[in-house]
Regions:
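N-terminal, membrane-interfacial amphipathic/helix-forming hydrophobic leader that caps
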Residues: 1-77, 107, 221-228
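Residue-level signature of transmembrane alpha-helical entry/exit and packing/kink sites
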Residues: 10-19, 45-56, 86-91, 128-132, ...
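Transmembrane helix-loop-helix hairpins at the membrane interface
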Residues: 28, 110-112, 117-228
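Juxtamembrane helix-loop-helix connectors linking adjacent transmembrane helices
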Residues: 37-51, 73-139, 157
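Hydrophobic/aromatic residues in alpha-helical transmembrane segments
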Residues: 62, 71, 101, 105, ...
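Structural motif
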Residues: 70, 80, 198-201
Length: 228
């Protein structure tokens, strides 16, 4: 059942379900952050990060519920399908290319402006390997549903423009991550976000984006901190 509230110029009705889904996907993480759940239930860095990971999975579950039981649509409508070999290759290739460009841009900025590495990266480097793996798995999967698959597809339907969906995803993703990563972290994050949005616009497949994000996060979270 659809609860229509208004009508976009593209002729697609905006339902309450889609509105709720967009709020959950795009802004659910920072809204939960305002509740300080991690700090309330844990006094350690490891505990806080694991609680944050659980929160991200809960948001994805909520979005899935909206799609399947409120919108009554398949998860394929937000890009959850097995990728073709070409789509998988695009995902992996974009991850490698994004890494090279992101680290190059960061290196130039650090050298030019004497910037320091983000505190978040130093904090992650001190965690145990199992916790790092949990953080990587959470990030590469949940963030692609929340900031790529759902919002890009639904905003494209509402506006009639795939580019508006992609641009919104890019801007919100950067804004949400900026407080944790700061200026120096925002440089590679911008490159990575462009790569991830580009992969989704090209493939319309969230699994391809997960492959891109996996390549990036494995290097940035598991490999790079060991050399810093």
């Amino acid at each position: 059942m659809s609860f229509d509230t208004t009508q976009s110029q593209s002729g697609v009705s905006v339902s309450l379900a889609v509105f709720v889904g967009l709020v959950l996907a795009l802004f659910g993480s920072p809204l939960l952050g305002q509740l300080d759940i991690a700090d309330r239930f844990s006094t350690t860095t490891t505990g806080s990060m694991l609680i944050n990971s659980v929160s991200m999975w809960a948001l994805v579950a909520a979005v899935f519920v909206v799609v399947r039981f409120w919108e009554r649509r398949p998860l394929g409508s937000i890009g959850l399908e097995m990728p073709t070999r070409r789509q998988a290759a695009v995902g992996v290739g974009a991850g490698l290319g994004g890494l090279v460009l992101g680290m190059l841009a960061t290196g130039i900025a650090v050298a030019a402006f004497s910037l320091e590495q983000p505190e978040t990266l130093s904090t992650i480097a001190e965690l145990s390997l199992p916790v790092k793996l949990a953080i990587v798995a959470t990030g590469v999967i949940t963030e692609e549903f929340l900031w790529r698959g759902y919002p890009i597809e639904r905003l494209t339907e509402l506006t009639g423009s795939l580019w508006i969906g992609g641009a919104t995803s890019f801007i919100v993703f950067l804004a949400v991550h900026f407080p944790a990563w700061g200026i120096v972290g925002a440089i590679p994050q911008a490159v990575f976000a462009l790569a991830l949005v580009g992969v989704y616009l090209r493939t319309r497949n969230v699994v391809a984006c997960i492959l891109t994000h996996t390549v990036i996060n494995v290097v940035m979270v598991l490999v790079l901190p060991a050399f810093l």
